C-alpha cells in the first residue's frame, strides 16, 4: 500500500514537472522571437543614429549570423544544459537591447555596436528557443509533433505580438520600445532557467538507441533505420559490448509493442555480471565508493557517446540530405521575408500606380502581419498533422516538407504574375497588391510548416541526445542560401533600375527572374524529398523482410 502511494505521488510530481517545463518552454519561445521585430524599429534607429539605409542589409545579416551561424554554439550549450542556455540567452538579449537603447538615446553612429547588438539578439533568442524545443521533443516522445509545434509556432508569432504591443503602448517612442523589449524578452527567456527540465525517463528512452546507432554507424552510412518516424521505434540487433559487465538491450516503445512481438523483438535485459561471493568483506562505504565511481564513468561515457553520435550523424548521407532541403527552403523564405517591402515599393513606384494615393507603409505592414500570422498557423498545424501521419498511416513526417516545397513552388510562380494589361490603374493596383498578399500568406504558411515539422524529423531520425547541436548545424544552411537568393534579387532589381532616382519602376519585372530561380529550386527540393521518402521506405521494407 505504501509503495503504491509512493508511486502515485511520484507520478503526480512527474506530470507537474512535464507541465511546468511545457508551459515554461512556451513562455521562453514567445519571448525569443524578437529577431523578426528588426523591421519594426530599424528605420527610426538608422535615422536617429545617422546610418545610411544602404547599411540595413549588413545589419540584418548580423541577425542571421547570431541566429544561424552561432546557432551551432547554442545547440552545444542546450545539449549540456537547457537551463544554462536560457540564462545565457536572457543575458545576451538584455545586454543587446540595452546597447540599442543607448545608441538611440545618445545618437551613437556606430555600425559596429548595432551589429554586435543584433548578433547578441540572434544568439540569445535561439539559445532560449532551442532549449524550449529540445525539452518539448524529449519530454513528450510519443507526441513530438504536437508538443514541439507550440514553442515553434509561438516563436514565429512573437514578432507580430511584440510589434502590436509596442505600437499600441509606445507609438513612435522607440527608446521606450527598447526598454520594454530589454525587460520583457530578457525576463521571458529567463523563465526557462527556472522551469525547463529534461526528465531522465525521457532521455532514457533514447539511451539504448544511441548505443545501437553508434554501433550501426560503423557498418553503414545510414546510422539508423527507424521502423516508423519516431526515434523510439527501431528495428535492429542488440548492442554487444566487449566488456563482460554490460547489458544487451532492445529499444522499442510501448505503442509499438505489437510490432516488436511480431518481429520477436521483445524488450529484455540480459546481464552476466558475477554475483558477489558471500564471503566478500564489503561495507556500505565500499558500495558508495563503487556507485560514485560508476556514476562518474557513466557520465563520461555518456558525453563521449553523445559526441561520437553527433560526429557520425554529421557524416551521414541523411543529414546531408536534410541540410540541403532545409537550406533551400529556409533561404527562399528568409529572402522573401526580408525583401517583400522592396517588392511593394517597386509596385508603388511603377507608372501609372505611382500616380495613385497608395499608402506603401500600410501595405508593407500588412505583409509582415500575414507572414507572421500564417507562419504561426503553419507551425501550429504541422505538428499535429505530422503526428497524425505517423500514427494513423505509418507515414513519414517528410510528407509535410513535400507540401511546403509545393507551396513555395506555387507562390514563386504566382508572385511573378503580370497585371500590366489592365488599363484601369486602381483595378491594377488592387490586383497587384492582392496578389502579393496572397503570396505572403502562402510563403508564410510554407515557412511555418517547414519549421514546425523539421525539428521533429531530426529528433525522430537522430534521437534527442545531441539534438540541439545537430539542429544548430542544420540551420546554418540558411545563412548561405539566403545570401545567394538575396544577391540574385539585388542583381535583378539593379538590372531593371533606371538612373533617375534609384527606384525600380518595372513592376514584377523587378523581381521576376529571382522567383523563376526559386521556382526551379522548389521543384528540385520537391523531387529530392520524394526521393528521400522513397529510399527510406525501401530501406524499411528491406530491413523488415530480412528479419
Curated annotation (Swiss-Prot):
Chain segments annotated as coiled-coil in the UniProt record: none
One Pfam family of this chain: MFS_1
GO terms under cellular component: fungal-type vacuole; fungal-type vacuole membrane
UniProt cross-references to Gene3D superfamilies, sorted A to Z: MFS general substrate transporter like domains (1.20.1250.20)
Extracellular side: 1-21, 80-83, 132-144, 197-323, 420-437, 491-514
Transmembrane segments: 22-42, 59-79, 84-104, 111-131, 145-165, 176-196, 324-344, 399-419, 438-458, 470-490, 515-535
Superkingdom assignment: Eukaryota
Alphabetical list of InterPro entries matching this protein: MFS (IPR011701), MFS_trans_sf (IPR036259)
Modified residues (Phosphoserine): 237
One example GO MF annotation: transmembrane transporter activity
Keyword DNA-binding: no
Disordered: annotated segments: 275-300
Keywords attached to this entry: Membrane, Phosphoprotein, Transmembrane, Transmembrane helix
Membrane side Cytoplasmic: residue ranges: 43-58, 105-110, 166-175, 345-398, 459-469, 536-547
Record's subcellular location: Membrane
Topology term for the membrane: Multi-pass membrane protein
UniProt protein name: Uncharacterized membrane protein YMR155W
UniProt organism field: Saccharomyces cerevisiae (strain ATCC 204508 / S288c) (Baker's yeast)
